[in-house]
UniProtKB/Swiss-Prot annotation:
The keyword Oxidoreductase applies. It comes from the Eukaryota. The lineage of its organism: Eukaryota, Fungi, Dikarya, Ascomycota, Pezizomycotina. This is Cytochrome P450 monooxygenase atE. Heme binds at C455. It is an enzyme of class 1 (oxidoreductase). Belongs to the cytochrome P450 family.
């Protein structure tokens, strides 16, 4: 009996030893696992050296990361990888690789990576950020059917030319507000077609709220602007004051977005209750509301997403072209000469003049290349494991389309920082033609994205740009104002965020003669019959 305490002691010690060994093994396992975090796994595309746990996260700037991505592409090639804690990011900066992966393997590359910030803002209902699935396909089909090329050729050009007529008048009578007129033009086209509502002036409430919202949305979504809560979920629980108030910023943008888009939807619904129906996209959707079975938030974001896409991209490129005219007068002179050889002073250019004005088309393509609205595109996500040229591309990787790096490649574009429309002398067609070619190197630019996520409004946007630029250069001469500000630098002259637009600049706007002035006034009067459908 005296030996029992000894046995009890041994039994207790044995349990403690076992527990200690188990805890030690667990600790070693955790340490080994931790030491793997941030490391580039064997088989991944090459990339910059990583740090323990962080990977490359510490190197990614909060703004303008496309410059660093392009620098890395020169060092590591057209496909390279980054580690952001546990997550892998694949960066594509090669025209052919882009085609081989994003276009030809579009089923795998059409997803979006998980985004806590995007979900907080949109609840998953923004088609730009929406996961690839049935709802996305339904919305995409609706947009495509309404904005397809045949619809643009048959109907939409009338609204575009009428709104361009007002834009010319706005430039004529209010040249000091030249930064706002292209925004009203593109916004009003979109509002008319999507909702049956015009933006009559640069002070339109919905337009003003939208562009303010887009600035905030763009800043929140820029690569590097938000703590990597998707890569390291534990960061969600750190007090926001130590993390740049990321959740608060996202929630504020989401509230503004939901408020605006829902308000516009209610205007349409109330109009229909009053017995007023218009041939807008949202009217068509509401006609078949039971078929599509969208909830209110989805309906609001379907229209709101189109309001965004149709307003911001076209106006940003028009403003970039006008700025280029103040910096490259020889280009403007060539454009004037081409227009004057085809169009007189008794009418402004129309969409039907497209084939007669190839230099204008070259200018638009060069603007896409020179000042892309989305320098890093919109991130894609890999659904399953994939590979390229022996390199492993793991599922759930984030895929960045480095549009800036491709557009500024000196091996493809001599003197890439300069605005030289002649680069596109052998590209007479519109952008959709080149996006559909099997050879990725034959594409004109990546301004509209790639794969199944390519901009569904591409046909409308191409016509927006041609009509606006041709009419503006027919009507006006744009000169640099030496007494004002005009920063045309790629590094400092554009806004920050995932969407870029040139910063406000001063310009001298001069109408090209009295006959053109009278034509502008007359064509605005003629446009009233089109406006009457939407007022």
């Amino acid at each position: 009996m005296a030996t029992l305490p000894i046995l009890d002691l041994w039994s207790t010690n044995k349990a403690l030893v076992s527990l200690t060994i188990s805890a030690s093994l667990l600790l070693v396992s955790l340490l080994v696992s931790l030491f793997q975090v941030g490391r580039r796994e064997r088989g991944l595309p090459p990339g910059p050296p990583t740090r323990l746990v962080l990977g490359n996260e510490h190197e990614i700037p909060k703004a303008d990361s496309h410059f660093l991505m392009s620098k890395w592409a020169k060092q590591y090639g057209g496909i390279f990888s980054l580690k952001r804690f546990r997550n892998t990011t694949i960066v594509l900066t090669d025209w052919k690789i882009m085609k081989e992966l994003v276009d030809k393997k579009s089923t795998n590359f059409s997803h979006r990576p998980p985004s806590k910030v995007a979900d907080l803002i949109t609840r998953g209902n923004h088609i730009l950020m929406m996961q690839y699935g049935e709802t996305w396909r339904t919305m995409r089909k609706l947009i495509h059917q309404y904005l397809m090329e045949s619809q643009c050729e048959k109907e939409h050009w009338k609204v575009q030319e009428a709104e361009a007529a007002q834009m010319l008048h706005d430039f004529l009578v209010d040249p000091e507000n030249h930064m706002k007129h292209p925004k009203r033009y593109s916004n009003s086209i979109t509002m008319s077609l999507v909702f049956g509502i015009r933006a009559k002036s640069v002070n339109d409430e919905y337009m003003t709220r939208l562009y303010s919202l887009m600035e905030k949305w763009s800043l929140v979504l820029e690569t590097g602007a938000t703590p990597p809560v998707d890569s390291w979920p534990l960061l969600q629980w750190i007090p926001e004051r130590f993390m740049g108030y990321w959740r608060r910023r996202a929630t504020e943008v989401g509230d503004l977005m939901t408020g605006l888009y829902t308000e516009v939807l209610h205007v349409i619904e109330n109009r229909r209750k009053a017995g007023i129906y218009k041939d807008s996209l949202m009217d068509r959707v509401l006609d078949k509301k039971d078929k599509y079975r969208f909830d209110e938030h989805q309906l609001a974001f379907l229209g709101g997403t189109l309001m965004e896409g149709g307003s911001d991209t076209s106006s940003s490129l028009i403003l970039a072209i006008v700025q280029a005219m103040t910096q490259y007068p020889e280009v403007q002179k060539k454009a004037h000469a081409e227009i004057d050889s085809v169009i007189g002073t008794d009418r402004s250019p129309a969409w039907s003049d497209f084939r007669k004005l190839p230099y204008i088309n070259m200018m638009i393509k060069e603007a896409h290349r020179w000042r892309p609205v989305l320098p890093l595109g919109v991130v894609h996500g890999l659904a399953t494991d994939d590979s390229y040229n022996g390199m492993h591309l793991p599922k759930h990787s984030t895929v960045i389309l480095n549009v800036w790096g491709m557009h500024m490649d000196p091996d493809r574009f001599e003197n890439p920082d300069a605005f030289i429309p002649e680069r596109y002398a052998n590209f007479p067609e519109l952008a959709p033609h080149y996006a559909a070619l099997a050879d990725g190197a034959a594409r004109d630019h990546f301004g509209y994205g790639a794969g199944r996520r390519i901009c569904p409004g591409i046909h409308l946007a191409e016509r927006n740009l041609f009509i606006a630029v041709a009419k503006l250069l027919w009507a006006f001469e744009f000169k640099n104002n030496p007494a004002g500000k005009n920063d045309a630098s790629a590094e400092t002259g554009s806004s920050q965020g995932f969407m870029h637009c040139v910063k406000d600049y001063d310009a001298i706007v001069t109408v090209r003669g009295e006959e053109r002035r009278q034509t502008i006034l007359r064509e605005l009067e003629q446009a009233q019959t089109v406006f009457a459908k939407y007022d």
